[in-house]
Amino acid sequence: MAPLTRYRADNDHVPLPFVEEYYEQRGSVPGTLLVTEATFISPQAGGYANVPGIHNAAQIKAWKEVTDAVHGKGSFIYCQLWALGRAAKPEVINAEGFDHVSSSAVPINMDSPVPRALTEREIQQYIKDYAHAAKSAIEAGFDGVEIHGANGYLIDQFIQDISNHRTDSWGGSTENRARFAIEVTKAVIAAVGADKTAIRLSPWNTFQGMKMADPKPQFSYLVSVLKELKLAYLHLIGSRFDEEKINFLTDIWGKTSPILVAGSLARDASGLMLRASHPNNAGSVVQKYPNSDVVAVFGRYFIANPDLPFRIEKGLALREYDRTTFYTPMSTVGYTDLPFSEEFQNTIHVGA
C-alpha cells in the first residue's frame, strides 16, 4: 500500500486510536507491505494539522499499537518520514512557533508566500531530525522507514533546480542539489541500517510547482549514488504520460533491491484492476521493467478495498473510492468502515 495522507491524528500529531484498525484491516492479507501516511520527523518539519508525527513518546506509543496489529496479521509496515518545507501552510507552521522554510526563497507559485532559505545549521539539524525519527520508528516497531523525497516536499525542493537556487554546497550543480537527499539517507542508514531504509522519488512530478526542464541527469545521478548505499528498496512514482518514463532510473537500479512503482497502473475494459504483478499480464510491471525486481504499489484503491491484494489475485471487482472522505480530519467515515469482499470473509471463516 502506498503512503496516503488521511488527517487522522489528533491536534498534537498523535495517531488516533482507530488508526490501528485502519492499518490492521489493510494488512489482513498476510505478506502485504504497508507504507504509512507521510509522518512528520520533528515539530519544525510540519505545517499541516492532524498529520501524525514520529518524534516523541506519545507518538511512538500510538504507532506501536499500529505496528503490533499489522504484524499480528502477518504483514509488514514501513513509516514514511516527512518534512514539508515550502509546502507547509504558513499559518499552521507559524502558529506552532516555526518559520516557513525551503531550500531557497522560492515560492511554489506567484500567489504563494515566499519561504525563507534554510541556513547551514538548520540543514544539519534536519539531517539529525531524520535520523532521530528513523530511530523512533524502529522503536515503535516499524519494519523500516521510507524517506519521502518526492512530490515537491523538502527533500525534493533541494533536488530540483526549479526550487533550489542555492549557490553554496547544497545547490548550483547536479551533485550539490542531490547532496541533501544523500546526506539524509546516509544519516538514516547510520541510525537504523540500510536494510531498514528506503526512499521515494518522483522525477516527473508537477505537483506544488515542481518538475525540472530535464530531470533525467539530476535523478540519474542521485539514483546512481543511492544504489551504492544498498537500500531496502527504491520507491518511484510513474507518470501518466508515455514520453515520461521511469525506465532510465529502473535500469540504473537494476536488481540492487526491489523497486516499488506507484502511479498510472493499467485497468482493463471491465473496470477490474489488472493483476499488475503477474508476469503474463499485459501492462504488468514485470513486462514494463524487465531488468529490475519491480513491485506494483496501490494507493486510493487500497482505501476502498482493505483486502485489495486478495481481490487482485482472485480477479474480483473493486469498490470505487470516495474522494470526499480522503481528507476528513479525525473521522472514521471512509476510513475504517469499508467492507471486505464476501469471498475474503469466507476464507477467514474457513481458516477459523
Region annotations inferred by a language model:
Residues 2-352:
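Flavin-dependent oxidoreductase catalytic cores
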